[in-house]
């Protein structure tokens, strides 16, 4: 694909920004008025025709104007986008809203999804952190009821997981305390996934070399932690915002979008790709290769990881291809950074409960 000259680039940027604002095909007269280029009508039409031939514009059959393609938007967000930074008051308001006195991660992340959807006027999505890579701080057991033991696992980063384990024998409180002391001595500092693997390995080769107490402690802990980390939460807010956009006024299109939101595993897979990124990731859901649910075709996903050196999750905004990236990208960045700071300052020191 040949590179664009300054004239073509300026014309394309003008068309994209006009289309973002209006959702309507953009004609040569509107481009001439807003591009700042002093071109004759014939020269402007020729430039737009060249951009169409190059795959950056397309012309709906019912209109003389042009609309930008996904290729045009990719060039725009990669090379032409000039984000509009949030003011200090707006940044502080987001940080204050997230840092209200609330120790439950789920509540804070629901608040984050609400902030994303409210500021962007699109869908806001937040993926809760996976605790698999969080490091084991301590585990405690307590009798819960006849045939049940409560396990409370505390992880670095302030995450707390609880599980009720069904057992076939009675355990005294003193015995359960000894179990916890033994496990914490051997597994503190390991990630949850490493500890889970180590527990299985130790039980497989236990034989006669371990005391009965150690074997029973390992067996109980395996049942307590074997499924921890499997049920990550995906929070979605702002579905009704989509009805404000021309792309979703069709009932069938909106139904497809709602169906896509229900495809939790594919959404998580799509959003988790952001975890390896250092900054905002913008994904255009255009074809099967991107792995997005079918109902997101023609949508864009603006996402960023949060958490830093604590367990990491993802914040994102989902909307039509013609989203106002200059305004929304800074919002996603701000929420991501505010959550990261919050996790570092508060949750490393004070446990918070996951659902």
UniProtKB/Swiss-Prot annotation:
The entry's keywords: Repressor, Stress response, Transcription, Transcription regulation
Keyword Electron transport: no
Pfam families referenced in this protein's UniProt entry, alphabetically: HrcA
Gene Ontology biological-process entries: negative regulation of DNA-templated transcription
GO-annotated molecular function: DNA binding
UniProt KW Transcription regulation keyword: yes
Protein family per UniProt: Belongs to the HrcA family.
Main function: Negative regulator of class I heat shock genes (grpE-dnaK-dnaJ and groELS operons). Prevents heat-shock induction of these operons.
Protein name, UniProt field: Heat-inducible transcription repressor HrcA
Gene name, Swiss-Prot/TrEMBL: hrcA
């Amino acid at each position: 694909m040949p590179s664009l000259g300054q004239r073509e680039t300026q014309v394309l940027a003008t068309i994209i920004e006009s289309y973002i604002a209006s959702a309507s095909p953009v004609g040569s007269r509107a481009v001439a008025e807003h591009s700042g280029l002093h071109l004759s009508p014939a020269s402007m039409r020729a430039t737009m025709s060249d951009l169409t031939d190059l795959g950056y514009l397309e012309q709906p059959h019912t209109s003389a104007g042009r609309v930008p393609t996904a290729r045009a938007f990719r060039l725009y967000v990669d090379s032409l986008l000039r984000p509009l930074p949030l003011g200090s008051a707006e940044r502080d308001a987001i940080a204050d809203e997230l840092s209200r006195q609330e120790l439950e991660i789920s509540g804070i992340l629901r608040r984050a999804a609400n902030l994303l959807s409210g500021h962007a006027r699109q869908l806001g999505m937040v993926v809760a952190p996976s605790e698999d890579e969080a490091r084991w701080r301590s585990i405690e057991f307590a009798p819960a009821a006849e045939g049940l033991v409560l396990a409370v696992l505390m992880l670095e980063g302030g995450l707390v997981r609880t599980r009720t384990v069904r057992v076939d024998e009675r355990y005294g409180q003193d015995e359960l305390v000894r179990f916890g002391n033994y496990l914490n001595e051997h597994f503190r500092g390991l990630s949850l996934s490493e500890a889970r693997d180590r527990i299985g390995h130790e039980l497989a080769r236990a034989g006669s070399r371990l005391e009965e107490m150690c074997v029973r402690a390992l067996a109980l802990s395996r049942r307590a932690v074997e499924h921890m980390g499997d049920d990550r939460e995906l929070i979605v807010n702002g579905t009704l915002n989509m009805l404000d956009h021309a792309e979703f006024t069709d009932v069938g299109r909106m139904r497809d979008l709602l169906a896509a939101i229900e495809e939790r595993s594919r959404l998580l897979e799509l959003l988790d790709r952001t975890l390896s990124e250092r900054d905002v990731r913008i994904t255009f859901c255009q074809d099967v290769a991107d792995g997005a649910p079918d109902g997101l075709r023609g949508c864009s996903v603006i996402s960023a990881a949060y958490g830093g050196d604590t367990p990491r999750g993802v914040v994102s905004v989902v909307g039509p291809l013609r989203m106002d990236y200059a305004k929304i990208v800074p919002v996603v960045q701000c929420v991501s950074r505010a959550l990261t700071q919050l996790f570092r300052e508060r949750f490393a020191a004070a446990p918070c409960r996951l659902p």
